[in-house]
Regions:
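Residue-level signature of catalytic and energy-coupling elements of molecular machines
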Residues: 13, 84, 133
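Transmembrane alpha-helical segments that form the membrane-embedded catalytic/substrate-channel core
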Residues: 2-8, 70-76, 94-98, 116-131, ...
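Multi-pass membrane catalytic core of lipid/isoprenoid biosynthesis enzymes
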Residues: 14-64, 139-182, 186
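Hydrophobic residues within membrane-embedded alpha-helical segments of Major Facilitator Superfamily
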Residues: 1, 45-48, 52, 70, ...
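Alpha-helical transmembrane segments
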Residues: 172-177, 198-208
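Intramembrane alpha-helical segments
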Residues: 26-113, 194-201
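Transmembrane helical bundles of ABC transporters
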Residues: 3-11, 15, 19
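Aromatic-anchored, glycine/proline-accented short structural segments
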Residues: 100, 107-160, 164
């Protein structure tokens, strides 16, 4: 479904992508692949995803079907709100909840904490990603958290990552993980808060 969502995103953004240096050569934007063919690929991927989905319990199937509109409306968000990255996190981390439901056949606080934390993780890293295109996006009129927080990106990104790290700590606590888990958390803590946040150079496309 994620691949199908990416195709739908590229179809929806094809006119915008043509105007952005980094994305102008994407297959659909550059017309190497027609919109019709891309749509066929998306349908095929959806069918494959459905064939996989029907092997799970009914609760998982229902919850997965509920999430489908999210995947197909995400591409529109950048036209209306400065928070498309938040919507991306809500959409593409939904699989965390589905994975839990497929095994436990119920929803508990643990996957919800993890889901919310992962949503902030996506919000952080996709905000960084957005700085590659910020100059083109501002000219075109596309919205993003990269633009909204362009004057103080490090604080916002650090905040997102701190929420994510707190969620990992809480999940470990709720699942009674031993001390090795918390020691292991030092690695993402250093990577996210130092190398991805404090040392971030938003003016450098390569750094983003």
């Amino acid at each position: 479904m994620r691949s199908a969502g990416c195709i739908v995103n590229d179809i929806s953004d094809r006119k915008i992508d043509k105007l952005v240096e980094r994305t102008k050569n994407r297959p659909i934007a550059s017309e190497k692949i027609s919109v019709f063919n891309a749509a066929i690929y998306a349908v095929i991927l959806c069918l494959i995803a459905f064939l996989v989905l029907i092997n799970f319990n009914k609760f998982t199937i229902y919850m997965a079907l509920i999430s489908m509109p999210l995947a197909f409306t995400y591409p529109l968000m950048k036209r209306f709100t400065y928070w498309p990255q938040l919507f991306l996190g809500i959409t593409f981390n939904y699989g965390l909840v589905l994975a839990w439901i497929s095994i436990q056949n119920e929803v508990s606080i643990i996957p919800i904490i993890f889901y919310l934390g992962a949503t902030f993780w996506t919000l952080g890293y996709d905000t960084i990603y957005g700085y590659q295109d910020i100059n083109d996006d501002e000219i075109i009129g596309v919205k993003s958290t990269s633009i909204k927080f362009k004057n103080n990106p490090k604080k916002f990104i650090s905040f997102c990552y701190i929420i994510f790290l707190i969620s990992l700590f809480l999940v470990g606590y709720k699942m009674n993980f031993n001390y090795l888990y918390y020691i292991a958390l030092i690695v993402p803590l250093i990577h996210l808060l130092i190398f991805q946040s404090l040392k971030l150079k938003t003016e450098s496309g390569e750094d983003c």
